[in-house]
């Protein structure tokens, strides 16, 4: 930082235990006013726990150590600002601001006012009023920050412009896409006029193109305005792009700190790129046949929507097939038809069970019901049973009745195949979903699909929450299980790098139509500039 920058935050020898489990161990670092810090690490390294602690969330108090904030404070009205504002008049009441040092978890007198000025963005959790419009959501936050009347409207419009949502002002929040919701959250948090901004994997589950929009909004609103930023990510590129210095967290400990570039380079040395196995796999005859399949919806605003439009496709047994295209191209709808979750509006669909072809357009136990048990599917909006342990989620909760010892052994084996070490797998079996990180929950949901040993596995955006190391492990386990369990995979994705690395063939979708089926390299040659932007260059 430039000379004269003031200390804003000190994290001193912090350890956090949940029961006997140490999740953070002896963590120390400092942050100066206006500085940006990245926290990089694999899923489950302790990044989110640390951010929740810095925000003062219930249950996240340090077991040992201190969190110290240095701020300027108005004794009269409780207004909080950055330390360099000490000695200037309070924005609210005109009283002089005093510089204070707050032991965040122990000085209860100041905690409430400080928490109100700490902004936080979490992955997969959108703190919005679902029934209110984008404008109303932002105005609500501005009113809480003391803005009134025309001043509030002007400020709201300025924020909406900065997050590039002018075309969504009157849309209600629950109808927005994930990336749009994140940008409304960002605008609401900036409306608080925070003295520090905490972003926990803010683009962890978004496609690269949408992630870029959120990143540019963060740059515009946080970095340009010199608001101190702490950002966690399992994507090294995000840390390098958005922060000046970084720490690398692994199993709750800091194993390196330095400039973002130094830390990212060191982290990347540990990532071994997955390469398709050399061994030839015998791809068998067709297992799925679609002929002129369509799925139409009626919408008041847009009339008839052709989500899937006249698709003909054959997928062979033991094949790893990629369904690619930009958001809204029809990939997920087609995957739901293949899974037997959605019936097509028209067309024919057969699924082979043994030597018999099942007509998937017919409902009931002799139609779709007969084949569905052989198909496993993991959607983007997966959900584990919150009040059941991970072991129960992998066994009895999904109707898998096994003797105790065998159930445990099979669960560990399956968890190892999705990137956990044997020790980690043993450890999480008796935990509940809320005790795991978002990335760990995603892998458990993937294990929940694989443990049933389906003949066809459909994965919808499987790499969304995965760090590069886990991504490669999952790629490896897909290839392994196709050989050992003779499984067929359909991977629905806009992560073209993953598809190139993993799939034998791919199909490109545009506006509900299947444009081309061929080798992944052939599909890449057909992509438009816009498609390349959305489908390449993770986060």
From Swiss-Prot:
Name under which the protein is recorded: Uncharacterized ABC transporter ATP-binding protein MJ1242
GO molecular function terms noted in the UniProt entry: ATP binding; ATP hydrolysis activity
InterPro entries: AAA+_ATPase, ABC_transporter-like_ATP-bd, ABC_transporter-like_CS, Me_Coenz_M_Rdtase_A2, P-loop_NTPase
GO biological process: organic phosphonate catabolic process
Residues the entry annotates as binding ATP 2: 325-332
Domain of life: Archaea
Ranges annotated as spanning the membrane: none
Source organism phylogeny: Archaea, Methanobacteriati, Methanobacteriota, Methanomada group, Methanococci
Domain ABC transporter, first and last residues per copy: 9-276, 288-536
Family matches, as SMART domains: AAA (SM00382)
Organism of provenance: Methanocaldococcus jannaschii (strain ATCC 43067 / DSM 2661 / JAL-1 / JCM 10045 / NBRC 100440) (Methanococcus jannaschii)
Residues bound to ATP 1: 41-48
Keyword GTP-binding: no
Keyword vocabulary terms for this entry: ATP-binding, Nucleotide-binding, Repeat, Transport
Family note: Belongs to the ABC transporter superfamily.
């Amino acid at each position: 930082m430039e000379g004269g920058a003031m200390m804003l935050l000190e994290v001193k020898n912090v350890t956090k235990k949940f029961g006997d489990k140490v999740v953070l161990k002896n963590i120390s670092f400092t942050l100066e006013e206006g500085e940006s810090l990245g926290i990089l690490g694999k899923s489950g390294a302790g990044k989110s726990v640390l951010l929740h602690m810095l925000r003062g969330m219930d249950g996240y108090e340090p077991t040992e150590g201190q969190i110290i904030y240095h701020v300027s404070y108005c004794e009269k009205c409780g207004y909080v600002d950055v330390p360099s504002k000490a000695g200037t008049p309070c924005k609210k009441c005109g009283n002089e601001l005093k510089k204070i040092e707050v032991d965040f978890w122990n000085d209860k007198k100041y905690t409430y006012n400080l928490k109100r000025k700490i902004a936080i963005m979490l992955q997969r959790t959108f703190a919005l009023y679902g029934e209110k419009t984008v404008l109303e959501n932002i105005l609500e936050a501005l009113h809480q920050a003391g803005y009134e009347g025309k001043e509030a409207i002007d400020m709201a419009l300025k924020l909406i412009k900065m997050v590039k949502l002018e075309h969504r002002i009157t849309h209600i929040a629950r109808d927005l896409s994930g990336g749009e919701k994140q940008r409304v959250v960002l605008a609401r948090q900036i409306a608080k006029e925070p003295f520090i901004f905490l972003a926990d994997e803010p683009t962890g589950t978004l496609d690269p193109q949408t992630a870029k929009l959120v990143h540019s909004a963060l740059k515009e609103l946080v970095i340009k305005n010199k608001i101190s930023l702490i950002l966690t990510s399992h994507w090294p590129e995000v840390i390098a792009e958005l922060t000046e210095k970084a720490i690398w967290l692994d199993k709750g400990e800091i194993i390196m700190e330095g400039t973002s570039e130094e830390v990212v380079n060191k982290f990347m040395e540990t990532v071994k790129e997955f390469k398709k196995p050399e061994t030839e796999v015998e791809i068998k005859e067709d297992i799925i046949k679609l002929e002129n399949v369509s799925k139409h919806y009626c919408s008041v605003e847009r009339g008839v929507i052709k989500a899937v439009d006249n698709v003909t496709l054959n997928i062979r047994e033991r094949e790893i097939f990629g369904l690619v295209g930009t958001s809204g191209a029809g990939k997920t709808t087609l995957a739901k038809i293949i899974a037997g979750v959605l019936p097509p509006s028209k067309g024919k669909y057969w699924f082979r069970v043994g030597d018999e072809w099942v007509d998937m357009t017919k409902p009931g136990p002799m139609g779709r019901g007969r084949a569905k048990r052989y198909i496993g599917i993991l959607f983007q909006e997966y959900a584990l049973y919150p009040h059941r342990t991970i072991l129960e989620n992998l066994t009895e909760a999904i109707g898998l009745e096994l003797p105790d010892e065998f159930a445990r052994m099979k669960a560990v084996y399956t968890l190892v195949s999705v990137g956990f070490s044997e020790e980690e797998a043993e450890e999480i079996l008796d935990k509940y979903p809320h005790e795991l990180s978002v990335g760990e929950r995603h892998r458990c949901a993937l294990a929940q699909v694989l443990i049933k040993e389906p003949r066809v596995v459909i994965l919808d955006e499987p790499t969304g929450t995965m760090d590069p190391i886990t991504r490669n492990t999952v790629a490896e386990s897909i290839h392994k299980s196709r050989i050992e369990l003779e499984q067929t995979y359909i991977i629905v994705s806009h992560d073209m790098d993953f598809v190139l690395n993993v799939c034998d063939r791919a199909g490109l979708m545009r506006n509900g139509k299947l444009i081309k089926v061929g080798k992944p390299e052939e599909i890449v040659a057909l992509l438009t500039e816009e498609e390349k932007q959305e489908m390449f260059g993770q986060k």
